[in-house]
Every structure is written in C-alpha cells, then in structure tokens.
Amino acid sequence: MRAKPLASIVSVGISKFGRREGVYARELFAEAALEAFQRVEKLDPGKDIKAAFIGQMSESYEHQSHNAPIAASWAGVPPAPAIRVEYACASSGTALRCGIMAIKSGM
C-alpha cells in the first residue's frame, strides 16, 4: 500500500533563456512564477500561497539583499512570508527542500 504524498509539485514555470539586458532576478522569478500559476486553474496566488521559498544568489550582482519579498510581490503573492535560500549552485533545490519541510511540518 502506498501512502499519499504530504507535498506535491503541481505546476512549474520557466523564464526565457538567453542574455536579457536590464532584466532583474525579481522579473525572471515573476515570469516563471506567473507561468506556473496560470497552469493551475483554480489557484488564487494571493489567497492560496502561504509562503514562498526562493532560491537565488543575485545579491552580489544586483546589490539587493531582500530579494525574496520583492520577487514574491512581483509575482503577486503578498502578504505571504517569502524566504530567500542561498546555497551556491544548489540554491533552488535547497529552497524546494525547505518548502517541502515546511509543508510536512504543518506550516
């Protein structure tokens, strides 16, 4: 007998590839997040999203240290808590892991 998963990935989005002058990390995040939101028919991001775990390392080249709340706001998910996770090349995977742990812990 298989147990039901406690956390599931229900949608994904991706920003356009290539060199994009003047486009900041918050815009790339919003582009991917909005695509993912559009794929979930009954999702209301402002109501249904309880927290955002965002993996990125753009602080050193964008000179912006509180990226997660800004990116979440650009994607339309305020006032949910937004946490930036930084772990070099594993930032996104670690953010996903933190989100799964939050769900499994009852957040």
What do these predicted regions represent?
Residues 86-107:
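Active-site-proximal alpha-helical scaffold in enzymes
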Residues 1-80:
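Conserved "HGTGT" condensation-loop signature of ketosynthase/thiolase-family condensing enzymes
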